[in-house]
A protein has these predicted regions:
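Bacterial extracytoplasmic/cell-wall-associated proteins, especially those involved in peptidoglycan
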Residues: 1-131
């Protein structure tokens, strides 16, 4: 898989059914982490594969769905276009610098939730800027 493809599959895995804005916002979080971690020479693949950072990667069933996702799937095609634009630096950050996101209705009570300010809300996801 190319870096564009990996990023697209994780974007789809995290934001399936959330539309283009939801996919862009998830992609923004990933790219914000790449920027934050640039001193460690991290790229998008390093960020998404980091242990327990993205639930779709850590869930075996979800990961299998992501890996078997058809390249003809309309949401995959949309996620791939978003991925390419994000990697080229051609998309604005609609999350205002968020480095985390969660669904407040279903997320476990993470210790960082109260510490990181919410910067953006979209449908079922809240986006927050970490340290």
């Amino acid at each position: 898989f190319s870096i564009e493809d990996i990023l697209a599959r994780v974007i789809w895995g995290e934001a399936e059914g959330e539309g283009a804005d939801g996919m862009q916002a998830v992609g923004n979080v990933i790219m914000n982490r790449v920027e934050r971690d640039s001193k460690y020479d991290a790229d998008a693949q390093d960020i998404v594969m980091e242990y327990k950072q993205f639930s779709s990667v850590g869930d075996p069933k979800r990961l299998e769905a992501m890996m078997n996702l058809s390249k003809d799937n309309p949401e995959y095609i949309q996620a791939l276009e978003i991925s390419k634009k994000l990697l080229a630096g051609e998309m604005e950050d609609i999350t205002n610098g968020a480095t985390h996101f969660y669904n407040p209705n279903t997320a476990a009570k993470y210790d960082w939730i109260d510490e990181y300010p919410v910067t953006f809300k979209l449908k079922n996801h809240w986006f927050a800027k970490g340290k």
